[in-house]
Amino acid sequence: MSIQTENKNYSVDNIEFKGYLAWDDSVSEARPGVLVFPEWWGLNDYIKKRTEQIAELGYLALGVDMYGKGKTVDTPQEAGSLMNAVLEDKHAIKTRLEGAYNVLKEHALSDSERL
C-alpha cells in the first residue's frame, strides 16, 4: 500500500479553495470517492490524517476546505466566526459542497458512479 496525497486547488464563486486529496497508489482501477468534512477548525492536520486513513480503505478521499485558501484556526472564537459566516450564506454552503464534489467526481481515479 502506498498512500499518495496532493493539495488540490479549486475555485468556487471566485474564491480559491485548497482541498487535500489522498489515494492508494497501488490500486490502478477507479475507486469510490468520499468527501471528508472538517470540524469547525478547518482542514487541519487531524482532518488530513483522517483523509489518508479513508484512502487506506480503498477510497479516493478529499478533505474539504470550507473556508477558502486553506484557512485553519486555533481558538473557538475564530472557529465560530468563520463557521457562522459560512452557515449564514446558504448559497455558499451549496456551491462549496458542489465544488468539492466536482473535484472528486472529475478526478481520473474516481469511479464517479460511487461517490
Predicted feature residues:
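Short, intrinsically disordered, charge-balanced linker/junction segments flanking boundaries
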Residues: 111-115
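Short solvent-exposed loop/turn micro-motifs enriched in small/polar/acidic residues
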Residues: 1-3
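Serine-hydrolase catalytic machinery in alpha/beta-hydrolase-like enzymes
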Residues: 7-110
